[in-house]
Amino acid sequence: MPNLTLPKEQPTLRVIPMVYDTNARGDIFGGWLMSQIDIAGATVATIRAKGPVATINVNKLTFEAPLYVGDVVSFYARVTRIGTKSLNVEIDVFAERNRQLDGEVVKISNAELVYVAISEPGKSRVIPQ
């Protein structure tokens, strides 16, 4: 496997999963990762939409490697498409294996989510250009 490095830009979100985030096998539960991906995606979508957004679709979600307790997990989110009321966000997830001395970086996941801009009462709204 090639030696990966983290992307040069700042991550949108960075977290360390804990023991209570594990599944029955002892690695990190996929649902936990999905929720963190959604948080990272919504962060950049909210900034670009200049207000609240709601997740309306997961176009793609791949699990490429397991996560473990103590990994330092970095989420890199970017807007890839802007429509009238919705926008697509791509999220790449990497882990620094905290328990290994060599600082191995592993690609964990890639996802594309769609968010719709909403008004305070929860109705869709136009995204400012």
Locations of the language-model features?
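Hot-dog-fold acyl-thioester-processing enzymes
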Residues: 2-57, 116-129
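Extracellular/lumenal ectodomain signal focusing on beta-strand-rich modules
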Residues: 58-60, 110
